[in-house]
From Swiss-Prot:
The gene is ASNSD1. This is Asparagine synthetase domain-containing protein 1. Residues 2-184 form the Glutamine amidotransferase type-2 domain. InterPro entries: Asn_synthase, Asn_synthetase_domain, GATase_2_dom, Ntn_hydrolases_N, Rossmann-like_a/b/a_fold. The active site is at C2. The keyword Transmembrane helix does not apply. Residues 286-602 form the Asparagine synthetase domain. SUPFAM superfamilies: Adenine nucleotide alpha hydrolases-like, N-terminal nucleophile aminohydrolases (Ntn hydrolases). PROSITE patterns: GATASE_TYPE_2. GO terms for biological process: asparagine biosynthetic process. One of its GO terms (molecular function) is asparagine synthase (glutamine-hydrolyzing) activity. It comes from the Eukaryota. Keywords: Amino-acid biosynthesis, Asparagine biosynthesis, Glutamine amidotransferase. It holds the Pfam family GATase_7.
Length: 640
């Protein structure tokens, strides 16, 4: 994970040897292990590159990297497959080596088409004065652009800063493909032309042309007039990394496999009925296999202390977790945690991060330890809010519980995981957030991370994910509760399951209105817009803590496998809630030995954590959120 930035100026009066302080600070929070800046100047333009690294694999490689020909590379990504990267190697160096060997545009596109894993990048090709940049197919890594000064400068960055009342604000770079800017031509013409090399969505020529035309129109709509978007003249494309969605419909009328299910009490045995079918069981086993591989890649590609003596390994209380799971106890996070348990070394704890928003000031974890003992290596008070109130709260209500829905299911899920593997240390971290703390940190830290997204839903989920991934809370054990700060640099999240497996209520609405054909179109739309609705925002809020978000359900092989299945093998919305939606995932949970969690219906994070109940109750999720507006104009990082 990295914070990457490139500020380009076309006029001498806008040349600068440094980024503004607030932007630099935001980038450093993403990459705390190394910071470096590099200046490239020509007669026509200046490029200031800034790289900030979170070290997760191979040798620590400072960014930006450069070669003897003047090429410069900034990489914010992880290669999990497609290009070979040995355990001791750094994928930044591998990518730059291959890029420097590319002889033409086709070679560059071929290289990025091979990469499986999340990425965003900026590449300056000195010989052609070209600046290449883009995001992966799903947009799993944030990249923003900011055009200002009537075409005299622009900036690309993993994260921005915002101010209200300014028209030329940061926007997300669309995950439509890779872009190239001819900097020399732009400096002469005083207009920026974005050449798009789009993802190839299908094999049909007319369909491709229509998709490219639609992409160009959508991108241009949000840009200033001096920025033009055009398809590349050679009509070159990136190869789509996943197979197309199977839109097939059943030949016979679609009915539930077991009509008596809807009239029966829902139990784990209800799901076992489906697994008696040989084909269904085989498909579920295949799904478990591909998802397990995705989780394995994401929990093993990170540095571990392999030099501990056997005596130190036995001191499990001193062992730090390297991996955390955003954990509600729901079906998505339970399956991710169960699969992570299969691959993470047994002597290593796993942090389960469970967030809840408090409606009462005097709310603490059950069985709070009044002595305030601190656990070795994790002794950090989670927030100012608890520093102020912990002593009084402990005396007033030592056994009071915070019973928001996600806390209840989280505790139940913890017991399931402990029963499945009692040898593992499962760190259940209760993260409790007060209204005062929410409002203060939204104002000072979170709002600019969520932006340029701006809805009530973005506010709720963005804030909830920020507090959860921070990992500052209470570690609840049989002996009581202790202040705890998660040390995990990798945070697993279940995003992508609902979009692919008909987990949202809107899938049910579409199915009831338009049947399986409508459901297919809804799922296709969900996957197509996930980059602009969710992933850039989540990457920005999680990375703000110097941690990296990893998304197993959006592994290219997982998506391809699910895309290859007909929709009725993934979900059956004629069945009751808690079974029909995400049916294949529930069957996988049963096969993995999970119990009650396999039957939990979908509950959105903003409702399960109760953040949606903290402030206004009469808002719609799609409304623009006034709480995200920043009052001061002093925070803008790129001069106007």
């Amino acid at each position: 994970m990295c914070g990457i930035c490139c500020a380009v100026s076309f006029s001498v009066e806008h040349f600068s040897r440094d980024l503004k302080e607030d932007l630099l600070c935001n980038l450093k929070r993403r990459g705390p292990d190394s910071s470096k800046q590099l200046l490239r100047s020509t007669v026509n333009y200046q490029c200031l590159f800034s790289g900030h690294v979170l070290h997760l694999r191979g040798l620590l490689t400072a960014q930006p990297v450069e070669d003897e020909r003047g090429n410069v590379f900034l990489w914010n990504g992880e290669i999990f497959s497609g290009i070979k990267v040995e355990a001791e190697e750094n994928d930044t160096q591998i990518m730059f080596h291959y890029l420097s060997s590319c002889k033409n545009e086709s070679d560059i596109l071929s290289l990025f088409s091979k990469v499986q894993g999340p990425w965003s990048f900026i590449y300056y090709q000195a010989s052609s004065h070209s600046l290449w940049f883009g995001r992966d197919f799903f947009g799993r890594r944030s990249l923003l652009w900011h055009f200002s000064n009537l075409g005299k400068s622009f900036c690309l960055s993993s994260v921005g800063t915002q101010a209200s009342g300014v028209t030329d604000q940061w926007q997300e770079v669309p995950a439509s493909g890779i872009f190239r800017i001819d900097l020399k031509s732009a400096s002469i013409s005083q207009s920026v032309v974005l050449k798009l090399y789009p993802w190839k969505y299908s094999s049909g020529g007319d369909d491709i042309r229509e998709c490219v035309h639609n992409s160009l129109t959508e991108i241009s709509a949000d840009l200033p007039t001096f920025v033009l978007v055009a398809a590349n003249e050679a009509k070159l494309y990136l190869k789509d990394p996943v197979v197309p969605l199977n839109m097939a419909l059943p030949q016979a009328a679609f009915e539930t496999h077991c009509s008596s299910i809807s009239r029966s009490p829902l139990t784990r045995e209800t799901l076992r009925v489906f697994l008696t079918d040989g084909h269904t069981k085989e498909v579920v086993q295949q799904f478990i296999g591909v998802l397990s591989t995705a989780v394995k890649r994401r929990v093993l590609c990170l540095p571990r202390d392999e030099n501990l003596a056997p005596s130190e390994v036995l001191k499990t209380s001193n062992r730090k977790a390297n991996v955390a799971v955003l954990f509600s106890g729901g079906i998505d996070s339970m399956v991710i945690a169960a699969l992570a348990d299969h691959h993470i070394p047994l002597d290593e704890p796993i942090d389960l991060l469970n967030v809840a928003f408090m409606t009462k000031e005097k709310t603490i974890p059950v069985n709070f330890n009044k002595k305030g003992r601190k656990q070795a290596n994790h002794c950090e008070m989670p927030s100012e809010e608890f520093s102020k109130h912990a002593a009084a709260t402990a005396a007033a209500s030592p056994g009071e519980q915070l019973s928001v829905p996600d806390r209840v299911t989280g505790r139940a899920g913890l017991k399931e995981l402990q029963a499945a593997n009692p040898s593992r240390i499962w760190n259940f971290v209760e993260i409790n957030v007060s209204l005062e703390e929410l409002q203060r940190l939204r104002r000072t830290r979170i709002s600019h991370l969520i932006q340029p997204l701006d809805t009530v839903l973005d506010d709720s989920i963005g804030c909830a994910v920020w507090f959860a991934s921070r990992g500052a809370g209470w570690l609840v054990t049989q002996d009581g509760a202790q202040p705890y700060q998660s040390s995990a640099k990798v945070v697993l999240t279940g995003i992508g399951a609902d979009e692919q497996l008909a987990g949202y209520s809107r899938h049910q609405v579409r199915f009831l209105a338009h049947g399986l054909e409508g459901l297919n179109k809804e799922i296709e739309m969900e996957l197509g817009r996930i980059s602009s609705r969710n992933l850039g925002r989540d990457d920005r809020v999680i990375s703000d803590h110097g941690k990296e978000a990893r998304f197993p359900f959006l592994d290219e092989n997982v998506v391809s496998f699910l895309n290859s299945l007909p929709v009725w093998e993934k979900a059956n919305l004629t069945l009751p809630r808690g079974i029909g939606e995400k049916l294949i995932l529930r069957l996988a949970a049963v096969e993995l030995g999970l119990t009650a969690s396999a039957l939990l219906p979908k509950r959105a994070m903003q409702f399960g954590s109760r953040i949606a109940k903290m402030e206004k109750n009469n808002e719609k999720a799609s409304d623009k959120c006034g709480r995200l507006q920043i009052i001061s104009l002093e925070n803008l990082s790129v001069e106007n």
